[in-house]
């Protein structure tokens, strides 16, 4: 198998040739089908404050990279590079022992039986990443979430976990994509015919659940995956009992001290 550096500028070209090449019939079908979805895709996949995330630029480009979306090549490469810098096991990624090619190959194979309108969402790359995270703290956070009945009340519904996986995968690349509600929703789109409004509402509910379980935190418009250490800090902050009377009394003392020149 060809080893493909995570920083390869031509990563998408290599992946297209090695993994995504299609026979003439499939290529022609996808190119002919693209105009039926072009406007919907362009209006659906609008990222906030993330200008470098590329979308399809032609019918041929759509057919060439299908079922993936162009932004995924650079975003995944950057994500894996940063994850490798934040975990010991993940260091294997940056040494080329795990090629970007393999991530796309395995994910394509997992989606081989999907309908022709299906797209790959970012969380669907996670099973390939999980093998290398092994027993890292971040992998344990997700594994424990999968066993939490408040997060997964129905074993057949793993959507809340999918949201958590996406937030982990983009945790260290906020220079590439801001983890806003809209952007998170975009990363979870799995069809060219996706009902984005319904998906957005589903994501919003998932975020509330994950916040209540202290697995993520909200920072203004952004939602951030929390490591074990960050969860502990959040717990300590939340356990500080500071009522309005305490604040008023402290403020009064400060004003008094200032007035009398203490």
What are these regions (language model features)?
Residues 8-12, 70-73, 204:
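Amphipathic alpha-helical transducer elements in NTP-driven molecular machines
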